[in-house]
Each structure stands twice: as C-alpha cells, then as structure tokens.
Curated annotation (Swiss-Prot):
Belongs to the MS4A family. The keyword Membrane applies. This is Membrane-spanning 4-domains subfamily A member 10. It is found in: Membrane. Residues 1-57, 111-119, 191-264 are cytoplasmic. Its main location: membrane.
C-alpha cells in the first residue's frame, strides 16, 4: 500500500500575521478600554531640569555673597576704632550675611531633595533677604553719602587707613547691590519648581489601562516562561486534525497546511 500526500498550503503557511504592538502573538487587535500611555513632553522635562540647575546656581551666588559680607564685615569690625560707622553699629554685615547664607543653603537643599516644606522655607528666607538687602543699602548709603564720617575723598593719590576703610565699605555696597537682584529670581524659580520629585517621576509613567485598575501588580514574566509559552503555542498550532472523506482518502489539517492522504 502506497500513500500519496498532497499539501494544500493554508493562510498560516503562506505568511505570518503581525500582531499589533502591546498584544499577545495570538491576538489580532488591541484589547478594548486600553488607555494609551501619556508621557511627559521632552521639552517640559528639559525645562524642569534647567530650572533646578538655575536654582542651584542662584543658591551658590547667595552663599558667595554671604561669605564676602562676613570677610569684609569682620575686617571692618577689627580695624575701625575711631570712626562712627552705622554699618558696624547695626551689625549689618553679620545678620545680612546670615540671611543670605540661609537663603542659599535652602535653595541648594530644595534642588537636592525637592520637598514642599523646603519650598515654603526658601520663599520665606528670600523675602527676609530682600528686606535685609534694603536695610543694608540704607545703612551703607548713610555712611557713604548722608552722614559720611570720612574727611578725605575716596580716590586720592596716597590713601591713608581711613580711605581704605571707605573703599571697603564701598565694596560692601557693591556686593549688597548684587544681592538685591538675587532674592526675587530665586523665589520665582523655587515657586515654579515641582514640589516633589515623586510628582516628576509620576509624570514620566504611563497611565494604567482602565480594565487593569484594581488588579494586583505582578512582576513581568521571565525569559524562560515566555519561551516556554511560545513553544506550547506553536505545539498547539501543529496539532493535527484527521478527517476521513472516503475509505481511501484522509484529510489531515495542522498548523502548516492541509494534507490529503490517499491509500492505494
């Protein structure tokens, strides 16, 4: 007895169907009620990073000016003995430097940790720093222009110790003017910055599909389980179905095609 087999290719043998992205290989369409992921725009994320970097730089400027106030104020306090300087009587170089130093540290800390209470503290300290700057401008201007205790002009050929003190106070005035332009930009940048790093990370995560909400979160399948599932699926496709049409003819159907087998 000889057997002749004729292969009739089916649709599965002629070509493979391409599944839609996000579905299983045996699915032909995307499940209903599936929400497409919404990611944060790259430009918006870059703006957030630039804003955080700017906040760190502003904090560094605060700290630098605070240290300069301490250096010049300490030198003036140690050298001036006979002159009556309002800037020293009010102790402006020290409480002004403390205000600027706290503002800078909070700005850098907020950029590092990004908490809501740090944001509020940063806004409050910058507001206090602004009042300290205005007060410092008033007391220094009173020493240099309104009630000047200096007899000789500030620019002379052979300066004495009094002229050096006058120049130091003028330098302190310049640093105070620079500090005047820092509290407002720092406060605005801190206000626009995100209150928490968790919110920034949450914007980068896709939305959960509505039909998956409430289900327990499970880890993704391993590589071996995926390979085993694919092999089982292929084995399931290759299961043959034998159907006898006539006493000498059988039709065999499997995943590769339809076989017609006859016996002579």
């Amino acid at each position: 007895m000889k057997a002749e087999a004729t292969v009739i290719p089916s649709r599965c043998a002629r070509g493979q169907t391409t599944a839609a992205p996000g579905v299983q290989p045996w699915q032909t369409s995307v499940p209903q009620n599936t929400t497409q992921p919404k990611l944060l725009a790259p430009r918006q994320h870059e703006k957030s990073q630039k804003r955080s970097s700017l906040l760190k730089e502003l904090g560094a400027f605060h700290i630098t000016i605070a240290l300069l106030h301490l250096v010049f104020g300490g030198y003036l306090a140690s050298t001036v003995k006979s002159l009556h300087l309002v800037v020293l009587k009010s102790w402006y170089p020290f409480w002004g430097a403390a205000s600027f130093l706290i503002s800078g540290i909070l700005a850098i800390t907020m950029k590092t940790f990004s908490k809501t209470y740090l944001k509020m503290l940063c806004l409050m300290t910058n507001l206090v720093s602004l009042f300290c700057v205005l007060s410092g401008l008033f007391v220094i201007s009173k020493d240099l222009f309104l009630e000047s205790p200096f007899e000789s002009p500030i620019w002379r050929m052979y300066p004495n110790s009094t002229v050096h003190i006058q120049r130091l106070e003028l330098a302190l005035l310049c640093f105070t003017v620079l500090e005047l332009f820092l509290p407002v930009p720092t406060a605005v940048t801190a206000w626009r910055d995100r209150p928490s790093a968790k919110n920034d990370d949450a914007c980068l995560l896709p939305n959960t599909p509505s039909h998956l909400k409430g289900l327990p979160v499970e880890p993704p399948p391993s590589y071996q389980s995926v390979i085993q599932g694919d092999a089982q699926h292929k084995q399931h496709q290759r299961l043959r179905e034998v159907k006898q049409v006539t006493p000498d003819t059988w039709i065999v159907t499997d995943g590769a095609g339809i076989w017609t087998q006859t016996a002579n």
